[in-house]
Swiss-Prot record:
Coiled coil: none
InterPro entries: Ribosomal_bL17, Ribosomal_bL17_CS, Ribosomal_bL17_sf
GO biological process, one term: translation
One cellular component (GO) term of this entry: cytosolic large ribosomal subunit
Annotated HAMAP family: Ribosomal_bL17
Keyword set, alphabetical order: Ribonucleoprotein, Ribosomal protein
Protein name: Large ribosomal subunit protein bL17
Classification lineage: Bacteria, Pseudomonadati, Campylobacterota, Epsilonproteobacteria, Campylobacterales
């Protein structure tokens, strides 16, 4: 039973799920808005909000911590220097999820996730 389980498995192994969230986070940082499945978006929100809170500090250690999760220099630099400073006075809630439509092939719910 999955009572009080802390995260969604998304039908993937742990390494595949970790890679998926990393790639979605990089795409969100690069484009500021992406469309994906609703449950992937909800998991990504948790992942990216923790990174943004860390990046708000803006020092070298924050840069290292974010890079350890993303493994992408450009995305790390953009998050720490451009995106996170905008939320210096905001305590959480850096992203917005909006349900958009249903995917034509399998009728799953799609959503856009974007920085507020």
């Amino acid at each position: 039973m999955r009572h009080k389980h802390g995260y969604r498995k998304l039908g993937r192994t742990s390494s595949h799920r970790k890679a998926l969230l990393k790639n979605l986070a990089i795409a969100l940082i690069e484009h500021n808005k992406i469309e994906t499945g609703i449950y992937k978006a909800k998991e990504l929100r948790s992942y990216i909000e923790k990174l943004t809170t860390t990046a708000r500090v803006g020092d070298f250690n924050a840069h290292r911590h974010v890079f350890a999760y993303l493994q992408n220099k450009e995305a790390t630099h953009k998050l720490v220097t451009e995106i996170a400073p905008k939320y210096a006075q905001r305590n959480g809630g850096y992203t917005r999820i909006q349900r958009t439509t249903f995917r034509r092939g399998d009728a799953s719910t799609l959503a856009t996730i974007e920085f507020v």
